[in-house]
Amino acid sequence: MTPNTTEGYVRVERRGTISHIEFFHPQSNSLPSDLLAALAKSITDEGHDPAVHVIVLRSGGDRVFCGGASFTELASIRAETQGLAFFSGFANVINAIRRVPKFVVGRVQGKAVGGGVGLASAVDYCIATQHAAVKLSELAVGIGPFVVGPAVERKMGLSAMSQLAIDATEFRSAAWAQQHGLYAQVVDDAAALDAAVDALAERLAGQSVEATVALKNALWHGTEHWGELLLERAAISGRLVRTDDAQSRIQAILSK
């Protein structure tokens, strides 16, 4: 199953009871709205299929896990409704991960920026390579990590999230991210990453379905309001991205 997008892809591959959902975009695995919609739909569909016991979320390529929002699309936003619609795409992906009654394992092979940190935070268990540095860059482009913030704070705590959000031009190492709870494991390279992810997915696929559902619900307790919260946060980002300041910063990045 391969949802069609204008550029890039979201692909779903079943390996027994394990579903691998992979996204790719030629611009550093950035996420335009069509890929976000396809990703949310794939996670929801696979997560509610009884034949699937665990989901692995991954990206194509070997250098960058996810570059965050598509700057090309951000530069095209002219109305608040457009901004809300775009940032709601990230909200929908995070909420899809939260709502499915299956564990979602993250495979992070390289750098995660902005929304990419949000994806790594939203998965139930994240394994990364030593190259998987993280950065919340939103403030530097005149916005802020409003949509992904709740997921990052839930996983790493307010202090670590604040450091990332305020130091918006600085990468933090994979070791730092592991120390602060984002990554459960950090391995040397892609081969070790695949081995660790596959081993965990196989173990989880063999666990009790009923116990998995109960544990996932318990782990996400207190986030029941995120359906509304993340859309409220998307509205903030959607308003800010239209400002002259944000658009000038976005254009400066695109012109590099």
Spans of model-derived segments:
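Conserved CoA-thioester-binding segment of acyl-CoA-metabolizing enzymes
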Residues: 1-58, 95
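Amphipathic alpha-helical segments at domain termini/boundaries
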Residues: 2-22, 165, 169-204, 211-224, ...
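Terminal peptide-recognition signature
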Residues: 21, 39, 57, 70, ...
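A general structural signal for well-ordered alpha-helical segments in protein cores
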Residues: 36, 71, 90, 149, ...
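Catalytic-core regions built around general acid/base machinery
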Residues: 42, 89-100
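Glycine- (often His-adjacent) and acidic-residue-rich active-site loop
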Residues: 59-93, 112
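Crotonase-fold acyl-CoA enzyme core
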Residues: 96-208
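Intrinsically disordered, low-complexity segments enriched in small/flexible residues
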Residues: 232-236, 240, 251-252
